[in-house]
């Protein structure tokens, strides 16, 4: 299996499977002399970690990260810093239940990558989905924590803005609320609604989709390049690569199709600090290059495909059959996708920042 690496200057390679011994990543291209400890990474991993509420999978993983290479104590200050060499990060798997999947090893789960992996490789890891499992995203979050250190001065924050057909009230958006509920929801009232709504979904054995919004502030103007290295191109690809993501938009995205030119174009004026935009329909990117405004991206996550109702499928021998998925699964995988989306945006920004420096100094 190839294509486990993304990025150009800031490159991330992930490895491991859901029920393997461990998962991890190698970050290559991180500049030297950046303070970095396991604690810097652990905080982000803890936000994504499973089993923290009744609304996520009850698989209990500590997700304790180990830095295997790429750092050392500074000879003068004693502070642990990056050396400029590849940074290897390891996260052990400790709560696998492969027996939960023994009955379906010869059946293709509807909505999962079982059939396509089998069609392409002639073999698949049926134990929790192997490499196609959302378990892999923990490695992205670890890499994203390193990226955040590279883009110091920029702030990347994510929020869950929709579950099923129910959207937040944007007039009530409060970033301070994100840590006060298990949904990463910036609307206090809607978070309470989500709890009741998702309880019903969970108890029925079903699942539901969601929309996540990621906002990057402090992004300087000039990141990205035309034509095939656009910042929004790489953001879309990075977010689309996350498990279960089925759609990505930048700025107003698909809503711009209903706008006129007068409504959509972000007008400008000169302010005391320089050029100012009067709106941000473009999501902080024009012509593939950052404008200096907040970069705004949203992505849609499909409902978790593993549900507790019988489904029609086929087996490896080509026979029609039914399947009932067991195991521990998220009723809304979009919840834990919030820190994953943040990580991917941070990695793309780190990559483009280094590419920008390499081109223009």
Swiss-Prot record:
Its EC number is 4.2.3.5. It catalyses: 5-O-(1-carboxyvinyl)-3-phosphoshikimate = chorismate + phosphate. Pfam families: Chorismate_synt. Its cofactor is FMNH2. Pathway: Metabolic intermediate biosynthesis; chorismate biosynthesis; chorismate from D-erythrose 4-phosphate and phosphoenolpyruvate: step 7/7. The keyword NADP applies. NADP(+) binds at residues 48, 54. Keywords: Amino-acid biosynthesis, Aromatic amino acid biosynthesis, FAD, Flavoprotein, FMN, Lyase, NADP. Reduced FMN (FMNH(2)). The keyword Amino-acid biosynthesis applies. InterPro entries: Chorismate_synth, Chorismate_synth_AroC_sf, Chorismate_synthase_CS. GO terms for biological process: amino acid biosynthetic process; aromatic amino acid family biosynthetic process; chorismate biosynthetic process. This reaction introduces a second double bond into the aromatic ring system. Belongs to the chorismate synthase family. Homotetramer. This is Chorismate synthase.
């Amino acid at each position: 299996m190839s294509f486990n690496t993304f990025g150009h200057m800031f490159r991330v390679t992930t490895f491991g499977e859901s029920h393997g011994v461990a998962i991890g990543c190698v970050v290559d291209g991180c500049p030297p002399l950046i303070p970095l400890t396991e604690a810097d990474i652990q905080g982000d991993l803890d936000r994504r970690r499973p089993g923290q509420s009744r609304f996520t999978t009850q698989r209990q993983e500590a997700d304790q990260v180990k830095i295997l290479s790429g750092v050392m104590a500074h000879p003068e200050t004693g502070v642990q810093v990056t050396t400029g060499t590849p940074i290897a990060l390891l996260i052990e798997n400790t709560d696998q239940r492969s027996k939960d999947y023994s009955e379906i090893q010869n059946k293709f789960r509807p909505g999962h990558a079982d059939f396509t992996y089998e069609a392409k490789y002639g073999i698949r890891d049926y134990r929790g989905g192997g490499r196609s499992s959302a378990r892999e995203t923990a490695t992205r979050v670890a890499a994203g924590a390193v990226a955040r250190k590279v883009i110091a001065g920029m702030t990347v924050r994510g929020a869950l803005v929709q579950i099923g057909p129910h959207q937040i009230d944007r007039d009530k958006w409060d970033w301070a609320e994100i840590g006060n509920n298990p949904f990463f929801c910036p609307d206090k009232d809607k978070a309470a609604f989500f709890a009741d709504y998702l309880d019903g979904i969970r108890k029925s054995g079903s699942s539901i989709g969601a929309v996540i919004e990621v906002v990057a502030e402090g992004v300087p103007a000039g990141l990205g390049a035309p034509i095939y290295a656009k910042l929004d191109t790489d953001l879309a690809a990075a977010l689309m690569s996350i498990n279960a993501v089925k759609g990505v938009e930048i700025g107003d995205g698909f809503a711009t199709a209903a706008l006129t030119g007068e409504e959509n174009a972000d007008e400008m004026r000169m302010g005391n600090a320089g050029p100012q935009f009067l709106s941000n329909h473009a999501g902080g990117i024009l012509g593939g290059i950052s404008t200096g405004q907040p970069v705004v991206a949203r992505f849609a996550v499909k409902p978790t495909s593993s549900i507790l109702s019988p489904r029609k499928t086929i087996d490896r021998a080509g026979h029609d059959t039914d399947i009932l998925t067991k195991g521990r699964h998220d009723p809304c995988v979009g919840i834990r996708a919030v820190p994953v989306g943040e990580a991917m945006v941070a990695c793309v920004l780190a990559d483009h920042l280094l590419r920008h420096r390499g081109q223009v100094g």
